[in-house]
Amino acid sequence: MPPNLQRIFPALCLLGVLFLLHCTPVLCGCDNPPVVAHGHHTQIIGLFGMKKDEVVYKCDEGYTLVGEDRLSCRSSRWSPAAPQCKALCPKPQIDRGKLSVDQDEYIESENVIVQCGSGYGLVGPKIITCTEDGTWHPRVPKCEWEYPEDCEQVHEGKKLMQCLPNLEEIKLALELYKLSLETKLLELQIDKEKKAKAKYSI
């Protein structure tokens, strides 16, 4: 007997003649719907509470469905191919960093290239991948300010603006420099007064 006839079919015996009745795909025997990792399926209910030969897939929280969400039992097979539930990774938060693909969430196996803004250097991997557990691998890198060698002893002028990474730090440096000048001036005045007193006391 052919493999497709080795199933139990509904039949009708009429006047001594056996008739095989047409059966729906579900009765003819689709196996259980495919199991999807990190997801689940529900069977569609039709009119009068009858179960239809269709199932709908949904993913667990933190996962997104890739593929068709609805499968039908046709010719004893589920069609189309079962979907996948892939993990979602949050957007990497990298101060002074830029991402090759800028979006709120990333799908499992998606790669992102990290670049740092002007004056900042990358500490860590340049390429990171969204993994199946919803985390990034390797570890998310950092962007740190690169301190030029010729900036070590800079205290004032145009060079100061070139060496400091942003306007806020330039303002702070200038305020500190101004304070240091005022302190030196005060020290000179005190020293001058001391010398004057010493001169008159002789």
From Swiss-Prot:
Q: Where in the cell is it found?
A: Secreted
Quote a single Gene Ontology cellular component term: extracellular region
Main location class: secreted
List S-S links within the chain: 30-73, 59-85, 89-130, 116-143
Q: Which InterPro entries match?
A: C4bp_oligo, SEZ6_CSMD_C4BPB_Regulators, Sushi/SCR/CCP_sf, Sushi_SCR_CCP_dom
Q: Does the keyword Transport apply?
A: yes
Q: What residue stretch is flagged as signal peptide? A: 1-28
Q: State the UniProt keywords alphabetically.
A: Disulfide bond, Lipid transport, Repeat, Secreted, Signal, Sushi, Transport
A Pfam family the protein falls into: C4bp_oligo
Gene Ontology process terms (BP) = lipid transport
Q: Which PROSITE patterns match?
A: SUSHI
Where does the entry say this protein is expressed, by tissue?
Answer: Plasma. Found on very low-density lipoprotein (VLDL), on chylomicrons, and in the D > 1.21 g/ml fraction of pig plasma. Found in liver, spleen, lung, bone marrow and lymph node.
Record carries keyword Signal: yes
The Sushi domain sits at 29-87, 88-145
Superkingdom of origin organism: Eukaryota
Instruction: Summarize subunit and interaction data from the UniProt record for this chain.
Output: Forms high molecular weight disulfide-linked complexes.
Cited function: May be a lipoprotein-borne regulator of either the coagulation or the complement cascades.
This chain belongs to which protein, by name? Answer: Apolipoprotein R
State the species of origin: Sus scrofa (Pig)
Q: What is the lineage of its organism?
A: Eukaryota, Metazoa, Chordata, Craniata, Vertebrata
Primary gene name: APOR
